[in-house]
Amino acid sequence: MREEKGVYTLLEACSILEKKKLSFSCHFVGKWSDIAQEVFYSKIKEYGIFNCVKAYGAKYGSDKLIYFKQASLFVFPTFYHNECFPVVLLEAIEQGLACIATNEGGIPDVIDEGITGYIVEKKNAIVLADKIEFLIKNPNLCRKMGEAGKKKFLEKFTLDKFENRLKDILLDILKAD
């Protein structure tokens, strides 16, 4: 896990939600990177969120898919400057999850504001917590956003769609010569 992926912002948002006595759990899945496990767990202790936050380390393939299947919402508060087009968001919408993320790189191409999820201000735990709380308290809307995200994935982001777009681009280049 990397600090620039918004880990500490999400932990702070979880602390805000815990103080409001909201019932939720937040699961972190990802390789330990510039954040040591000890530091991560000391933040959890500092915020008093042991009961609602868990970390599982790196998971791949079907092991990672289990976590998407168990989730009702995906949160990605990144401010990583090389975020380009995060595959993890495509994986989340493919599984029918509403997403909350930041306006970094190609994220606005994946998340349609208010339709497939929400785009929030970077490093703002209060706004992030508000959006998470809103979707937890509105599960039907959260589910509809997830369905809209899955539809968008099938319309724009499958391997077949990618291959067809690439083929069209290459044909256009050949025609231009």
Task: Annotate each PLM feature.
Residues R2-I16, E83, I126-V127, D160:
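A conserved mid-protein helix/loop that constitutes part of the nucleotide-sugar donor-binding site
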Residues E38-K59:
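Nucleotide-activated donor-binding/catalytic signature segment of Leloir-type glycosyltransferases, i.e.
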Residues A58-K59, I66-A71:
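Short alpha-helical donor nucleotide-sugar binding micro-motif in glycosyltransferases
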Residues E113-G114, Y118-A125, F134-N140:
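Conserved acidic donor-binding segment of nucleotide-sugar-dependent glycosyltransferases
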Residues V127, F134, L141-K156, F162-R165:
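A short, well-ordered alpha-helix in the C-terminal region of glycosyltransferases
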